[in-house]
């Protein structure tokens, strides 16, 4: 996906504590302590969305290193989109778990919004299904 806008990805805080800290700070990532409820991070992300910034969230909460196309989703992405009126642009990546990562492929879904009165459980399931479908499409592209 080509965009002129910077995507500020939520990233595990350990990346900001590594020798590559400079890179993640320069890239504009937002550190997340995955072991605790991170209201402060969500408030920062919400404020950034309301100011027109783009936030990237891995809704599974981590990279998926299993055989399953998608793990259960956390609620941060749908909750933020519902609260701020931001668009969700589903994106899935395949081909990153092998020894050779030269065949990585992405698939991007249609942007959509979540209604202010929508049920978050249902919206999370809708997002999960969209991501699973996109993952299968991306995986097929890795075989080409």
Question: For each predicted feature, which ranges?
Answer:
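Short secondary-structure boundary micro-motifs
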Residues: 6, 13-14, 31, 39, ...
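Non-catalytic C-terminal accessory region of glycerolipid acyltransferases
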Residues: 42-144
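Short acidic-hydrophobic sequence patches enriched in Asp/Glu that either
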Residues: 19, 37, 72-76
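Catalytic core of membrane glycerolipid acyltransferases/transacylases, capturing the structured
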Residues: 1-36
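Glycine-rich, highly charged phosphate/nucleotide-binding loops
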Residues: 36-42
